[in-house]
Each structure stands twice: as structure tokens, then as C-alpha cells.
Amino acid sequence: MKMADFVNDGINVDEIVIENQENPNIFINPFKSNPHNVTLSSFRDARIYDLQIRDRPDKYGSGWEVQRSYARKRYGRWMRTVRKNPGFENFRRQPIEVLQTVEDEFGNVYVIRKKINFRAKLPQNMVRRNDGGKNRVNFTAQSVQKGINVDDQDFRPKMFTPKMGREISALRNKLGLTQTDLGKRINVDANVIRNIETGDLVAFNVQDPMVRSLAYALGIRTIKYQ
């Protein structure tokens, strides 16, 4: 494959610091060479960036190089350009180590460690070795019986229903308490009492200390979900 299409563009000569070396190397233009023959040292040659040094070797001599940091930046940009070409997607990429589980006909499970190319499509039973670092667990609602649609309501937390709110409001008025007074007794804000009496706004759990305190303040044994 010829690399004549890789044009050396976007070079700012002001960013380059050119130094003279005693042992010059053979000039290799990385943008017109086989990518397998190009190395990081190829981008240190100042003749790539300054046409005067390349066209007038009798005047400027040879062995001029740029600083290594600039050559590394240009090498990385060239590498990304090469990898955009078909067949060079994994050019000079380190393979990824993965673990694959295999089960034989006797039910024995084996774990095989292998290396694959970067961005290769992983099989369904293959997991990257470094995967799962975030310890994230995703739960999906599924029915125990096959063919039955799952209702999202079954997986939502229980809330104080409007019917429960009306009964709590009636008990509060029977005791002659306002929403603020009842909230002070159970150490909550009056807005919480208002949301409980409205319904479908506050989570209900019979083991919640707030729910137990509310039942005690209203003079009942427990609050039943209905």
C-alpha cells in the first residue's frame, strides 16, 4: 500500500525547535512511505517540516532534528490518519486480553484466556478482563411465568394512597390538630403531612419509623395499606 495520500499539512514551523545532530540518518518521508517502515524517529527529521533544509543540503547540511515532544505529537496524528484506512484499523495497537468461558458436552466449564485485536467484535459469552470496575448492577423486571406481561406498578414502591390520606386527615381533625401540629409531633415538616393526605406523593412502609410515629400520634395501633 502506498502512502502518497497522506499529505503533510497543518505544520506550524514556529512550534519547532531544530537542532543539529552529528550523525544524520537517511531521509524518510513518512507521508510517502510504507507505514510499517515508519517509526517515531522518522518524525524527528527537520527536513519534513522545513523545505529549505531539504532542498539545500549543501547550504544547511544534514542531521537537523526537532524536539521529541513535537515529533511524538506529529507521530500520533499520522497514526490516527493511517488507522482510518481499511485494513489498518488495528495498526500498531496492543491486543486486548479477554476471558472466554467454554462448556463441553459433559457440562465442564473452562475459562480460556486469549488476546484479540482492538475494536474486534466480542462474542456474547466473552467479557473483557477489566470490565465491571464500576460495580454497576442493572435490574430488569421479568415475570416468573413465561408469556405474562409485567406491570410496572408491581415494581414501584408503595405510596400513601388518597384513601389513606383521607382517613389520616379525618383522624387529625378528630384530634383537633393542624398539619403543622401533627408534623411537630412526628418531627417532620407540615408539607410532608400535606403530601401524605394528598396521596401518591410519599412512600409508605409499615416498618418506617416515621409511619410508626404517625400512627402513634393519631392514636391508632398501625396504619394499614389500602
Swiss-Prot record:
It comes from the Viruses. The keyword Protein biosynthesis does not apply. GO terms for molecular function: DNA binding. SMART domains: HTH_XRE. The keyword Transcription applies. Transmembrane segments: none annotated. CDD domains: HTH_XRE (cd00093). PROSITE patterns: HTH_CROC1. InterPro entries: Cro/C1-type_HTH (IPR001387), Lambda_DNA-bd_dom_sf (IPR010982). Residues 179-198 bind DNA. Residues 168-226 form the HTH cro/C1-type domain. Keywords: DNA-binding, Transcription, Transcription regulation. Pfam families: HTH_3. This is Uncharacterized HTH-type transcriptional regulator R559. It comes from Acanthamoeba polyphaga mimivirus. The lineage of its organism: Viruses, Varidnaviria, Bamfordvirae, Nucleocytoviricota, Megaviricetes.
